[in-house]
């Protein structure tokens, strides 16, 4: 039993999503470092961590899953930024052909994001989408009146995280969790989180393995209940 636990413990460690040494712009400018992400994780933990929302689906549900929330916000920001740059209007106002074109580019960029020599290169458009997304979280975890009602809905107090730098690092941590949920694990067609959360904008849909294990789990549960009864 201990051997099995040890084996799976090692596998979890080995298969854990990587924390890159740095994220850089196309010109090579350093944007996020490994330490920034760890500082952001610590900042998040000081607010109660998984007692306020969840990350990767683990935590309390009175607030959103921050991974899923960040990912969707960043994707929609990317689409709006690109749509305005190329067509002069928001993504929702484009015709079907234009939307399909942009979604294909979005999917290629996000799912194709990879670590090379400890570094991930981000496009200028993605950086702009990240910055817009980060501002929402910096506002939410502070005392900005613009997000006060949202804080009330999430049972968050004003200045949940009073230090501005801590809020900026928190945003970088949330970004990293979303990056792991969208970037494909090398030599696979699934993200580091096995295509969780569901996000059709970039084809984050359940893998065959997910479906099989979900069915198997239900079967084993019913069988176990039947055995006990």
Identify the meaning behind each predicted range.
Residues 1-10, 44, 52, 210-229:
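Hydrophobic cores of alpha-helical transmembrane segments in multi-pass integral membrane proteins
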Residues 15-211:
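Soluble extramembrane regions of membrane proteins in the secretory/endomembrane system
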């Amino acid at each position: 039993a201990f051997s099995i636990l040890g084996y799976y413990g090692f596998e979890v460690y080995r298969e854990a999503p990587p924390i890159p040494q740095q994220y850089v712009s196309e010109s090579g400018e350093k944007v996020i470092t490994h330490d920034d992400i760890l500082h952001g994780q610590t900042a998040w933990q000081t607010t109660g961590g998984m007692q306020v929302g969840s990350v990767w689906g683990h935590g309390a549900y009175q607030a959103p899953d921050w991974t899923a929330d960040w990912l969707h916000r960043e994707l929609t920001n990317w689409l709006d930024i690109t749509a305005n740059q190329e067509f002069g209007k928001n993504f929702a106002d484009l015709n079907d052909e234009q939307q399909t074109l942009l979604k294909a580019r979005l999917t290629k960029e996000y799912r194709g994001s990879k670590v090379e020599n400890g570094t991930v290169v981000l496009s200028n458009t993605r950086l702009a989408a990240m910055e817009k997304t980060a501002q929402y979280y910096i506002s939410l975890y502070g005392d900005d009146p613009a997000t006060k009602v949202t804080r009330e809905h999430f049972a968050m107090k004003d200045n949940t995280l009073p230090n501005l730098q801590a809020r900026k690092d928190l945003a970088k941590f949330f970004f990293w969790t979303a990056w792991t949920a969208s970037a494909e694990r090398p030599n696979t067609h699934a993200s580091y989180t096995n295509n969780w959360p569901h996000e059709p904008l970039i084809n984050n849909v359940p893998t065959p393995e997910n479906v099989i294990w979900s069915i198997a789990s239900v079967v084993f549960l019913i069988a176990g209940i039947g055995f006990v009864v």
